Amino acid sequence: IHDAQENHPKKAIKFIVPPNCYGGTNDQARRVAACIENVEVVDLPVDGDNEMVQSIETILAKIAAEDAIPYIIAEIPTNPRVEVPDLIQLKNALSTVRKTKTGDIAIDPVFILDQTFCPNVLFLGADDLLSSVRTLSYASGSKFPSGGKCTAGYVVGNKKSEALMGKIELHLQLCDNEATALQYEILASQLPSMNQRIQDAYQNTRDFVNFIKDTLPSAKLNFVSEDLAAQGFTPSVFSLDLPTKGTTDQERETHKRALNLKLINLMISEIPNESKFCVSYGQSQGCYWTIPATSTQGTTKEGDKDYIVRVSLSPTMDLELHKKVFLEFVASI
């Protein structure tokens, strides 16, 4: 916003954000927009019947016509459906030169990519997919980058977004929000082994997902395909839509929510040292259960919350015990 106000004074600024985008990202975007007159949040539908690239195409065309400034915040893979868009189509949608109503060239978008789920995938290098698009990539550090040892994350810009990085640095310092010396030390020591932790946690997750498919085939699971995993998208989080019953939508939803809590309460009571019930992408140990699977932050509208279970696994956990307890749950329903 600071950069836009300096380079394009008085122009409208649009933050394009999935309404169910996770946690603080969604919350902060809406709080900032509420404070500044020419800043507005535009919903980016990426879930259900909506597809990220198509939604971006539609919204960017509209914003270009208005001669406004587009900042897109998105997660790849998405939350909570763990989907990856067609990346070539995404690049094309972000690279298209658009025109304003008066025929001038519209301001190109900045793609702000939350890579917390898959920080191992390279998007920004000279030969990588988004090298030609103004892109910022950021990741929460609490799970993989720091090995669960601190909460500091990081943001990286490509060549096209270098000008924005200076402003980000300035604001981190203004807000006294830069990582501490100790956090830098932790990240420096942990990052070299990050990719191995990601792989180990993915293997546990794939194993657990396959087990659930076998033991409760009527459940709907959202996780990356084997093909996407082969491309490097190896998250360690999946969402679980439990089978429900009832004659009305309300009855089915109520029954499903009760089942969600039954499953989670069984897990945390049977495996108290590893299974945790909280809003988290997890740490380097144990297994984290979140409901609703979308943001629980106060600014997220109730209708955008998805009451399915989000499960986040780690590289070090007793997977066989989790399978055993899940089997108990299946037997009980």
Report the location of each language-model feature:
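Phosphate-/polyanion-interacting regions in eukaryotic proteins
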Residues: 1-20, 32-34, 87, 95-102, ...
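Conserved beta-strand positions
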Residues: 74, 113, 240, 311-313
